[in-house]
Design a protein with these regions (language model features):
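A secondary-structure boundary/capping signal
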Residues: 48-49
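Cytochrome P450 core scaffold surrounding the K-helix E-X-X-R motif
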Residues: 17, 55-62
Length: 161
């Protein structure tokens, strides 16, 4: 296991006129040339989690975090991710740094996440076979895992635990 900084390098068009690159935390369009270079096995990672949150926005109200957890007892799941070592300016006060950066792949939300966050949800892996497939399979095969997690695999919970 290795600590990394969340947020892959932003596409060049996003950075025009900016002094910093805050990074991209969620990658959905895996056909983009910007992301394709990091989709091979050497740049894939998994991120363990027991809970995650999405912001729920209701018109006229402050966004609030809604937490999701696996339905299995004490279950750890994994986000499918990509990573790279990159030199950039993330924050002006830090200046230029070289970091291992990562982001999650995302997909259309399942029936549990969609009412809260209709845009997307992370790609979630559960089985040892899915983990191995994501980490080692050829790109076209690995990307078949970029699909919504089954509705019965997640539940809404109170807080981060």
């Amino acid at each position: 296991m290795q600590m990394m900084r969340w947020g892959m390098p932003s596409p060049a068009f996003v950075l025009k006129g900016k002094k910093t690159d805050k990074g991209v935390t969620n990658v959905r369009n895996t056909t983009s040339p910007h992301w394709r270079r990091w989709l091979g096995p050497a740049h894939r990672c998994v991120v363990p989690f027991t809970r995650f949150s999405e912001y729920q926005t209701i018109k006229g109200e402050k966004p609030k975090s809604v937490w999701f957890a696996p339905t299995g007892p004490q279950e750890t799941l994994f986000f499918a991710g990509i990573w790279t070592n990159w030199t950039s300016v993330r924050k002006l006060k830090e200046g230029e740094t070289t970091d291992n950066l990562f982001a999650f792949l995302t997909v259309e939300p399942n029936g549990v996440v969609a009412p809260i966050h209709p845009k997307a949800m992370p790609v979630i892996l559960r089985s040892p076979e899915a983990l191995a497939h994501w980490l080692d399979a050829p790109v076209e095969e690995a990307l078949k895992l970029q699909r919504p997690f089954p509705d019965d695999g997640l539940k809404i919970v109170d807080g981060p635990g």
